[in-house]
């Protein structure tokens, strides 16, 4: 262990063949540990015909249906041998989780210059470099909570069920047909991408879908298209160039998202 400079935590987290786990696998192990220690997820639910603790259901989804979602993205890049790490299932999963965390952090930030904030910079580094050492940052700064896990479960359940249907209706109306926005974008991820990602997720979370009815998932696609039209108009303002301006728009999007499933009839 000393020879390879492994920490105690990383040394313990080896699979049966002695292979060091990936950053995401370590993160997932700690995240599931967090869920198991949260009494919110102790109660039993029916899952595929079995009565299981909620935390066991979440752990199962991580390894199966949710991983299948990101595998569909990975398959699109199987020929790119040089960049296989950034297009792996683990990498897509890791980025997705951190983009949720980063958006929450941006909106909740109360300082004056977030670009200089150490936590923000560390989260960006983790997102881009797929870097993970331990769970301390997420726990001590309350970056992950019971609410975060519940929202994560809803989002990933929805994307796992109707991902393609959602992806087909996210583009701004004025863009060329060849342009295709994707929530799984890897390269050149911008603040516009963060704002759109936030808006899509808020539409899902305000749709009335919750953890007890994920087997019957349905979104009103026409209402999604209407919502995305409003969102693209908001974020396309050329004056929105600083992260402070981005945060202001993200805050507005979060405030009006309670009406996102019928935005036209709720605009005053």
Protein language model regions, located:
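Flexible coil/loop and intrinsically disordered segments
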Residues: 1-268
């Amino acid at each position: 262990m000393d020879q390879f400079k492994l920490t105690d935590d990383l040394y313990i987290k080896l699979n049966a063949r002695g292979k060091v786990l990936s950053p995401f696998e370590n993160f997932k192990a700690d995240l599931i540990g967090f869920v198991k220690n949260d009494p919110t997820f102790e109660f039993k639910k029916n899952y595929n015909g079995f009565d299981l603790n909620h935390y066991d259901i979440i752990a199962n989804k991580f390894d199966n249906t949710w991983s299948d979602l990101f595998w569909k993205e990975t398959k699109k890049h199987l020929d790119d041998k040089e960049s296989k790490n950034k297009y792996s299932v683990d990498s897509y999963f890791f980025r997705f989780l951190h983009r949720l965390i980063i958006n929450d952090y941006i909106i909740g930030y109360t300082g004056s210059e977030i670009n200089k904030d150490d936590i923000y910079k560390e989260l960006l580094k983790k997102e881009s470099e797929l870097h993970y050492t331990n769970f301390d940052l997420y726990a001590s700064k309350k970056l992950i909570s019971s609410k975060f896990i519940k929202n994560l479960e809803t989002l990933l359940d929805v994307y796992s069920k109707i991902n393609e249907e959602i992806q087909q209706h996210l583009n701004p109306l004025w863009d060329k047909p060849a342009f295709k926005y994707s929530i799984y974008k890897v390269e050149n991820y911008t603040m516009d991408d963060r704002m759109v990602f936030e808006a899509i997720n808020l539409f899902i979370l305000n749709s009335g879908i919750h953890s007890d009815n994920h087997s019957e998932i349905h979104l009103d696609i026409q209402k999604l298209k209407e919502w995305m039209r409003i969102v693209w108009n908001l974020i396309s303002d050329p004056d929105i160039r600083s992260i402070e301006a981005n945060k202001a728009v993200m805050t507005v999007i979060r405030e009006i998202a309670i009406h996102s499933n019928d935005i036209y009839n709720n605009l005053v």
